[in-house]
């Protein structure tokens, strides 16, 4: 297991109301990695159109016979749209009770693994206690995220594992703002100067 920390790693990005890119409107993104070379994160509050059993079948983790035998919680396990970059690749944010050689520790008991093995473990209910599976990710080249933040595109917030792995996606945007002490109804898309 390796450790990844720096800049905004382990923080949330919350899209401002003036976000012009429709792919990121009302998005809450967990930053997995951030350095001088760029940034990478997973959108937390958008569902993907594929369900978990179909994803497992598509990746060859299970066959059609095994699909029928999956437990109900596994059949209902949500797959998130992680972002527009590499949309066919799977990524798992998870609690630190699961680790393999490829696992990266991000922050505060949160890890990141992008292997078939973790999907197999989750499908057999032998994976991490908390997990978030996503297809694709949000990526920024060097200086791009910093520029978007400086032009009022994103708010930055700390988070906790309990909030990160909370399953209710419909309220995650508003809850992210409320946790910062911001009433979403009063958040303006334009910034002012005195």
UniProtKB/Swiss-Prot annotation:
Listed Gene3D superfamilies: VC0467-like
Ranges in coiled-coil conformation: none
SUPFAM superfamilies xref list: VC0467-like
Highest taxon in the source lineage: Bacteria
GO CC annotations on file: cytosol
Family: Belongs to the UPF0301 (AlgH) family.
This protein's name: UPF0301 protein BT_0659
Species annotation: Bartonella tribocorum (strain CIP 105476 / IBS 506)
Lineage of origin: Bacteria, Pseudomonadati, Pseudomonadota, Alphaproteobacteria, Hyphomicrobiales
């Amino acid at each position: 297991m390796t450790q990844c920390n720096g800049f905004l790693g382990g923080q949330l990005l919350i899209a401002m109301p003036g976000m012009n890119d429709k792919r990121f409107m009302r998005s809450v993104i967990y930053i997995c990695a951030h350095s001088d070379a760029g940034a990478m994160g997973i959108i937390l509050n958008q569902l993907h159109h594929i369900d978990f059993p179909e994803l497992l079948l598509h990746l060859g983790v299970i066959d059609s016979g095994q699909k029928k035998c999956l437990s109900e919680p596994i059949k209902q396990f949500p797959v998130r749209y992680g972002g527009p970059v590499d949309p066919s690749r799977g990524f798992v944010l998870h609690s630190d009770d699961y680790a393999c050689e490829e696992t990266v520790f991000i922050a505060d008991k949160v890890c990141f693994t992008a292997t078939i093995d973790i999907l197999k473990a989750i499908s057999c209910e032998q994976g991490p206690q908390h997990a978030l599976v996503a297809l694709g990710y949000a990526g920024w080249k060097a200086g791009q995220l910093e520029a978007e933040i400086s032009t009022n595109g994103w708010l930055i917030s700390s988070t906790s594992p309990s909030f990160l792995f909370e399953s209710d996606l419909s309220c995650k945007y508003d809850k992210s703002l409320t946790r910062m002490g911001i009433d979403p109804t009063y958040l303006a898309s334009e910034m002012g100067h005195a």
